[in-house]
């Protein structure tokens, strides 16, 4: 797949061919339909965000269509979904108390793992995802998952 990768701070992102993501058992692979650009992306691009390092595929506000679902996933191929910025595990005591936004096992696409500045993105913990109505365009929906 093609992806936009940060190779150097303050330089253009590099469009490269990289391996397709592997599908998580409890998640999905989305074909990215739209991905926004947010202030934290800019902070990473200029080297001011401690979690975004050269080599990272950014993109944390996105939506897509399921092309593959893991065996423990609740969504199926063809579903259109939007993802939040913070993917909580859903099973730790913090998540069980309703504070998933502070989950110690959280995953942050575009920060702690490859994001959606790519053709495809792996999304673990699919309980975080939300189905998109057919009437909502991907470009409008993409920003809904950002904080």
At which residue positions do the language-model features occur?
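Cytochrome P450 core scaffold surrounding the K-helix E-X-X-R motif
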Residues: 40-45
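NAD(P)H dinucleotide-binding glycine-rich loop of Rossmann-like/cofactor-binding domains
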Residues: 89-147
